[in-house]
């Protein structure tokens, strides 16, 4: 057991999906995994392990933001030796050619979080996805005929930010805004593990188009299937 995850070591697979919402973790386990059992309920952050096409897979809620996901992925790697971590989450588009429900593969992320500047003594470390995971996910998405976008995302430290620089970020090619990828990629690099963020556009910051909270919790199956297929091909 770790501080925030109440599982025994053998109860968590070495490949894991990471939704922010614990109810989405429950949905993934019940919808896609066979024989899924719940290994964690600490703080209501649900975690499950089951099989997908004969491969053992876990899914763990992480909460929102850099501090929360950092706790869970650190404990998953440090205490449970998880090797492959794939975030499945939502993001807000800031490019006109990125549409609601498009799937984004985050190649890298920039951030206004101070996490890496504190870690690297002021250096602007550039967190990146694992290339094997990124390439595999892209190929799977194309096989499925999905509207995939590959590029940079922005990991925001604040959800409600009156001084957001979204227009400038868009000019520099950033596709969308979310709140966790920088932490995932940085910590995966620290521990020598594979990581990827597979994101569904839940709303468009420029146009105001959005999905409902219920849709964000229980849909976006294409993203989940891409993540699961990517995990089992590793």
UniProtKB/Swiss-Prot annotation:
Q: Indicate whether Transferase appears among the record's keywords.
A: yes
Where is a purine D-ribonucleoside annotated to bind?
4, 162, 178-180, 202-203
Q: Which UniProt keywords apply?
A: Glycosyltransferase, Transferase
Q: Which InterPro entries match?
A: DeoD-type, Nucleoside_phosphorylase_CS, Nucleoside_phosphorylase_d, Nucleoside_phosphorylase_sf
Query: Pfam families of this UniProt entry?
Result: PNP_UDP_1
The UniProt entry's sequence similarity note says: Belongs to the PNP/UDP phosphorylase family.
Name-wise, this protein is Purine nucleoside phosphorylase DeoD-type
Q: Which organism is it from?
A: Geobacillus stearothermophilus (Bacillus stearothermophilus)
Primary gene name: deoD
